[in-house]
C-alpha cells in the first residue's frame, strides 16, 4: 500500500470540497501521517483494488457481522459457498487488472484482497526455494474454512503446486 522508494511520483493539483479536505486532514492527523501520504494511500487503494472490486458489486460489512454469518452456517455450507463463489470474482478481477491468469497474477490478487479487502493480514517469506504465505485473521475456525476453500478454487484456475494448512486464526500456503 505504501509508495516504494523506486516508484516515480508526479505532482498534480485537485479541487476537492472543503468538507472532504477537512475530513482528510483530520484522518491524517489521527494516523500521525502527512496529508500527502494519506491521499496517496487512498489513491493506491482505489487504483489497485477499489476500481476492480467495485465492478463486481461488493457488499461492505463489518468483520463481526460476517463472522456472525459464518457462525450461523454449517461448515459444509461454508465450503460450498466458498468453492462456488471462489473462482468467479477473483478471475474477473485478475483478468480486468492483468489480462491473464498466471501464478503471479493470482498471488497479486491474494495480496491485494488482503491488503485492501481488510479480512486478513498478509505475510510472505521466501526460504530455500519455497514461498510461504500466511494470512492471519480474526474470523475463527469457520473463517479459515471459508478462506481456505476460496484459495483452493483460485489456485485451481492456474497450474500451481501448493500446500495449504489452517488454524483458527490463520491460513498458510506453501508454494
Where in this protein do the model-derived segments appear?
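Intrinsically disordered, low-complexity segments
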Residues: 59-63, 147
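Short, basic amphipathic alpha-helical segments that act as recognition/interaction helices
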Residues: 33-57
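Short, hydrophobic/π-rich interface segment
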Residues: 112-167
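An N-terminal amphipathic alpha-helical segment
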Residues: 63-132
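Short Lys/Arg-rich basic patches
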Residues: 1-18, 28
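Beta-rich nucleic-acid/ligand-interaction surfaces
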Residues: 166-175
Amino acid at each position: 500500500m505504501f509508495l516504494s522508494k523506486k516508484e516515480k511520483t508526479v505532482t498534480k493539483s485537485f479541487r476537492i470540497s472543503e468538507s472532504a479536505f477537512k475530513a482528510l486532514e483530520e484522518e491524517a492527523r489521527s494516523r500521525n501521517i502527512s496529508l500527502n501520504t494519506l491521499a496517496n494511500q487512498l489513491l493506491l487503494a482505489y487504483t489497485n483494488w477499489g476500481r476492480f472490486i467495485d465492478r463486481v458489486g461488493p457488499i461492505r460489512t463489518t468483520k463481526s457481522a460476517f463472522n456472525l454469518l459464518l457462525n450461523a452456517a454449517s461448515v459444509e455450507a461454508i465450503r460450498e459457498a466458498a468453492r462456488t463463489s471462489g473462482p468467479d470474482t477473483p478471475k474477473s478481477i485478475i483478468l480486468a487488472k492483468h489480462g491473464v491468469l498466471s501464478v503471479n497474477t493470482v498471488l497479486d490478487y491474494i495480496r491485494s484482497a488482503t491488503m485492501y479487502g481488510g479480512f486478513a493480514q498478509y505475510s510472505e517469506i521466501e526460504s530455500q526455494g519455497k514461498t510461504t504465505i500466511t494470512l492471519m485473521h480474526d474470523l475463527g475456525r469457520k473463517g479459515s474454512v471459508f478462506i481456505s476453500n476460496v484459495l483452493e478454487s483460485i489456485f485451481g484456475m492456474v497450474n500451481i503446486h501448493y500446500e495449504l494448512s489452517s488454524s483458527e486464526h490463520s491460513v498458510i500456503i506453501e508454494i
